[in-house]
Amino acid sequence: MNTEASQDQTVTETPGVRLRQARESLGLTQQTVAERLCLKVSTIRDIEEDNAQANLASTFHRGYIRSYAKLVHLPEDELLPILEKQAPVRAAKVAPMQSFSLGKKHKKRDGWLMSFTWLIVLVVLGLTGAWWWQNHQAQQAEIANMVDQSSAQLSQNGGQPVPLTDDNSDAIAPTDAPAPVANGQPVPLTNHSGSAITNSATTSSVPKTTSTEPVDTANTNTTMHQEGAASAAVSPSQVPQPGMPTGQPPLPTADAGVSGSASSVGALVMNFTADCWLQVVDATGKTLFSGIQKGGAVLNLAGKAPYKLTIGAPGALTISYQGNPVDLSKFIKANRVARLTVGVE
């Protein structure tokens, strides 16, 4: 009976139990054993409880047990037969290895996913390109329509762009008009429509002499031309008023010097660096200018503010309103027809 009991006790003593008993007999703790073997405390606990870790290979597990046995002075020959008996049981618990077909399925699925992603990217790029092309074609068609309208207006005006303004409005300020000369001296011109008196009007106002009186025709003509040239330089403010002495010549007033600058108040000044189609409409709906201007031209327009401008090529000109520059940078960067309102208070 004692022999059978000892055999049962030997069989029931697993490697973990024997290692734990040897550790306790030496007075060591699990923490001490773990530090000496450079293992985790949980690994030492699993070895003593005979719990094989699923993610740990059997080779490493046996190596840990051998190191543990050497530390607590247990012979390896007593533990290895017990480990060999437990090996089939542990081998049955090992999960089967995945086949290569599963990896191929994953790769195939990843390939389809990448193909679908590239397809979406190509569709987005195609739609973006189509949208840009449609906008570009619409802009080109709009510019071509403006050019056709301008060409039709040029053909009606005899090939010259003529701004549509009132007779008394200074739509285009003359810049290179020569000044008249009286007695060898330049005479300033004024912009008042009622201040200019022509030579023919002066001539008609001279009373005709009768044939009975001898008249020196040469002196008469010279006097008439001198009077006509002098009267052309007289502004309305210089006309003698009733009650003023007629013997003294009228003095020049301040209106004669500032008449040219007064007409530029509220005016638009445009300097063209290249050929450009332009249309300007004032607040009354009157078209001040509509046509093509050549590069190097300077256009001065005056009307009732605000002005509505349509510019075919914003980068081909610079605009200033009342001496202040007008910003066209956003239209130049967008490379499109500029539609803006200038002079809004």
Curated annotation (Swiss-Prot):
For the region Disordered, what residue ranges are annotated? 151-260
Domain of life per record: Bacteria
Show the InterPro entries listed in the entry: Bact_Cytoskel_RodZ, Cro/C1-type_HTH, Lambda_DNA-bd_dom_sf, RodZ, RodZ-like_C
Recorded GO cellular component terms are: plasma membrane
Where does this polypeptide localize? Cell inner membrane
One of its GO biological process terms is: regulation of cell shape
Q: What is its main location?
A: membrane
Q: How does it sit in the membrane?
A: Single-pass type II membrane protein
- The chain's disulfide connectivity reads none
* Free-text domain note: The helix-turn-helix (HTH) motif in the cytoplasmic domain of the N-terminus is involved in the formation of spirals to maintain the rigid rod shape. As this protein is anchored in the cytoplasmic membrane, the HTH motif may contribute to protein-protein interactions to form the RodZ helix, which is localized beneath the cytoplasmic membrane. The C-terminal domain may be critical for determination of the rod shape by probably interacting with enzymes required for synthesis of the peptidoglycan layer, including PBPs in the periplasm.
Name of protein: Cytoskeleton protein RodZ
Which species is listed as the source?
Answer: Yersinia pestis (strain Pestoides F)
